[in-house]
A protein has these predicted regions:
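Specific transmembrane helices
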Residues: 25-110, 129-141
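Membrane-helix interfacial "entry" motifs
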Residues: 14-21, 63, 67, 71, ...
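Short, strongly hydrophobic alpha-helical membrane anchors
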Residues: 1-20
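Short, charged cytosolic
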Residues: 1-3, 46-61, 146-162
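A transmembrane-helix-recognition feature enriched in membrane-embedded lipid enzymes
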Residues: 72-75, 268-279, 308-311, 315-322, ...
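A membrane-cytosol interface segment of integral membrane proteins
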Residues: 210-212, 284-332
């Protein structure tokens, strides 16, 4: 009974954390996203000499063809399952970023000896830490994303996310548990090692500037266009901005069924690692015709059970030698 109580309690707190003020789906984040979307909508309407009406804005932001699509209902089911049901499993199976940080400090101390903190201004140390933590987060995200696209047995799990035929904010957690755990742990290791090295060098002042208890850079991203990555709203960045940041259009190209867009734009908030490793594709300013989904295998993802079970089967097939049947065996 104690286990069941802990399971229910931890799951409840995990779910609630996503909706707290500092959570990704907290009221400040979602309200600011709506205001940002309104700003984009109003600016475009006025550029065409048309009034910006609230009713039209809401209709364009939440079109019936998307809100009532079967893909959206699957988004809802997987979103609820991953947050409210499986949340505790993720917290138990995830590496502790703070633990990695402390282990890194200990390892550096053993290898290099005690180190007096560098006497730099606190604001400068925090700025360096904020940027370094963001880059470490993004590198881990890019690397994990690259692996799930590069190796077919991992792609089978990532297909769950790409199976979305339309995209909404909830598509973010249209993910297989294997993928979620992989990303969470990669990010924990990357950011933990980075923060450990910075703490060893600069002392306890090495922590990020925060907004609503999160890295200020990531939170600003979520409070503006971050939630629009998975949407039908075409907002693209060109020039230097398009090389530094992931616009919603960057990620919409990533989900495209056009082979020219495959394996592009693997970053989360930043485009710098895509730029560095040759996986960047800058979207055009005007809306490109983009279709989403994974084609003929969509039927594998029309129920929650299939969505979670089929990737294991298909992934295993990549390691199982194919025995020729009489019909497929080569003929002399």
């Amino acid at each position: 009974m104690e286990f069941l109580h802990r399971l229910a309690t931890d799951d409840f707190h995990y779910a609630v954390a996503n909706f707290k003020s500092g959570g990704p789906y907290g009221i400040p984040s979602l309200v600011c996203t709506l205001l940002f979307a309104w700003f984009v909508f109003a600016r475009r309407r006025r550029a065409r000499g048309r009034p910006a009406e609230l009713k039209l804005f809401l209709r364009s932001l939440f079109p019936r063809r998307i809100m009532l699509h079967r893909s959206t209902f699957m988004d809802m089911r997987l979103w609820i399952l991953n947050i409210a049901v499986l949340g505790v499993a993720y917290t138990w199976l995830a590496v502790s970023g703070l633990g990695v940080r402390d282990a890194t400090i200990g390892a550096l101390t053993r290898m290099l000896g005690e180190h007096a903190p560098t006497p730099w201004p606190l604001a400068l140390v925090m700025a360096i830490t904020t940027l370094s933590a963001l880059l470490a987060y993004e590198l881990a995200y890019w690397f994990g994303h690259y692996l799930f696209h590069r190796f077919e047995f991992l792609w089978e799990f990532h297909k769950v996310h790409h199976s979305a035929e339309v995209m909404t904010t909830l598509t973010e957690l249209r993910q297989h548990p294997v993928e979620i755990l992989a990303f969470v742990n990669l990010i924990a290791v990357s950011t933990g090692v980075t923060l450990g090295a910075l703490t060893y060098a600069f002392g306890p002042g090495a922590h990020s500037f925060t907004l609503l208890n999160a890295n200020i850079a990531l939170m600003l991203f979520l409070m503006t266009w971050g939630h629009l990555r998975h949407s039908h709203i075409w907002l693209s960045f060109q020039g230097l901005a398009g090389h530094l940041f992931q616009s919603p259009a960057h990620h919409q190209l990533h989900h495209s069924t056009n082979p020219e867009h495959f394996n592009k734009n693997l970053g989360f908030a930043l485009a710098v690692w895509d730029w560095a490793f040759g996986t960047l594709r800058i979207p055009t300013k005007t809306c490109e015709v983009v279709e989403f989904g994974v084609g003929e295998t969509h039927g594998d993802y029309d129920t929650v059970l299939r969505t979670f079970a089929r990737p294991f089967q298909r992934s295993a097939e990549h390691f199982t030698p194919v025995v020729p049947t009489p019909e497929s065996a080569p003929r002399a």
